[in-house]
Amino acid sequence: MKSIIEVKDLSFRYKEDQDHYDVNNVSFHVKRGEWLSIVGHNGSGKSTTIRLIDGLLEAESGEIWIDGQLLSSENVWDLRRQIGMVFQNPDNQFVGATVEDDVAFGLENQGLPREEMKKRVAESLELVGMLDFKNREPARLSGGQKQRVAIAGVVALRPAILILDEATSMLDPEGRRELIQTVQEIRKDHQMTVVSITHDLELSLIHI
């Protein structure tokens, strides 16, 4: 199966005068539809690697290929549309007054027809079990519910790649398992590639 992410000899440091690299000569690939867990302690370069893949940071050396295209300053915005990211604290991602408005926000930026937008919002909220909460304020949801809404907002955009950057670290063990199970179902149903960043080795094995 063809690789949708290919990283070759990637190196990066936040300051040029640093003695050490935050990411040093890293290479890996992810096949379409796979689930890759990147596990490591805080400060090991996990999130930095993901930000390089998403084009939020620029590598000092090496190559990043997304779906057969070499990531560059010319195509970074186009390739970024293929990637959806969910972060540790979903409160930083919410922009809508209601759950429904928040999931619709990204679709509005894409200029989708209103009926198609409503359909995608409903489908995405249904997928994560949050359709009954569509009129709630995101701030009034539990931690697990907030993460489900954040995932729905990403899934509605139909990216080829979903990146979870410590997205379950603020949840209790049961909430983590439920969220991972939900993402696993979405991955299978939509042939989505998932990259999960975590420091929890046990959590990285749940989806297997």
Annotate each predicted stretch with a short phrase.
Residues 54:
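Helix-to-loop junction immediately C-terminal to a conserved catalytic motif
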Residues 115-133:
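Conserved ABC ATPase "signature" region
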Residues 162-165:
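Catalytic Walker B motif of ABC-type/P-loop ATPase nucleotide-binding domains
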Residues 158:
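Conserved catalytic motifs of ABC-family nucleotide-binding domains
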Residues 137-141, 145:
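Conserved ABC ATPase signature
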Residues 39-41:
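The feature captures the beta-strand-to-loop junction immediately N-terminal to the Walker
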Residues 206-208:
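Conserved small/polar residues in nucleotide/adenosyl-binding loops
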